C-alpha cells in the first residue's frame, strides 16, 4: 500500500491514525507499505540535516514525533515491511509557490517552452503543479545525494 505524503499529511500527523491505517492494511492482507517521505515541495517528513522538514501543509501541523520512525516501528510490530519513496527531481509546488525552488534555489528549476511565453522557468508555468529540477545542476545533484 502506498501512502502519499501530501494527501495524508494531516491524517498522519497523529500516531493513532498511522496505527489505524497500518492495522487496516494488515487486516486485509497487505504485507508491505510504501511511505512517501519527500513530496514535490522538496521538503521531507523526517528530521534531516540536508533538507527542510515539512512541518505544515494546508494549515495542518505535523505531529510532535518522528513520522518515518513511527511508521517503521509500528509497521514492524505488525509484521509489515516498510519502504520509502521520494520525489527526486521535483522541489516545488507551483500551485502554492512553495518549495526549495521558491525559497532559496530558483536556479535549480528546469526551464520549459510554452507557445505564448517561450522558454521560462517551470516555476512560472502554473498549469504544471510540480516544479521539476534541472538534473544537470551539479549543486542540486550533490544536495539530493545527501538527502538519499
Predicted regions and their residues:
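Hydrophobic faces of well-ordered beta-strands that scaffold small-molecule active sites
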Residues: 1-3, 33-35, 82-84
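A short acidic, glycine-rich active-site loop
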Residues: 55-64, 110-112
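Glycine-rich, proline-tolerant flexible connector loops at the mouths of alpha/beta enzymes
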Residues: 37-60
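Catalytic domains of carbohydrate-active enzymes, especially glycoside hydrolases
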Residues: 16-43
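Short, well-ordered coil/turn segments that N-cap beta-strands
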Residues: 29-31, 76-82
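Anion (oxyanion) recognition and catalysis
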Residues: 69-72, 76
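Aromatic/hydrophobic pocket-lining residues that form the small-molecule binding cavity
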Residues: 18, 64, 68, 141-144
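Active-site-adjacent "subsite" loops/lids of carbohydrate-active enzymes
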Residues: 1-15, 89-147
Amino acid at each position: 500500500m502506498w501512502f502519499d505524503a501530501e494527501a495524508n499529511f494531516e491524517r498522519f500527523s497523529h500516531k493513532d491514525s498511522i496505527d489505524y491505517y497500518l492495522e487496516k492494511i494488515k487486516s486485509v492482507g497487505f504485507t508491505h507499505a510504501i511511505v512517501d517521505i519527500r513530496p514535490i515541495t522538496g521538503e521531507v517528513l523526517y528530521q534531516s540535516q540536508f533538507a527542510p522538514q515539512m512541518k505544515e501543509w494546508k494549515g495542518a501541523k505535523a505531529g510532535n514525533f518522528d513520522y518515518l520512525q513511527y511508521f517503521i516501528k509500528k509497521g514492524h510490530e505488525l509484521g509489515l515491511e516498510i519502504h520509502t519513496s521520494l520525489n527526486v527531481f521535483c522541489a516545488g509546488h507551483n500551485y502554492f509557490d512553495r518549495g526549495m525552488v521558491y525559497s532559496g534555489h530558483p536556479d535549480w528549476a528546469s526551464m520549459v517552452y510554452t507557445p505564448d511565453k517561450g522558454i521560462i522557468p517551470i516555476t512560472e508555468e502554473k498549469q504544471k503543479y510540480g516544479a521539476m529540477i534541472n538534473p544537470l545542476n551539479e549543486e542540486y545533484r550533490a544536495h539530493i545525494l545527501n538527502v538519499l
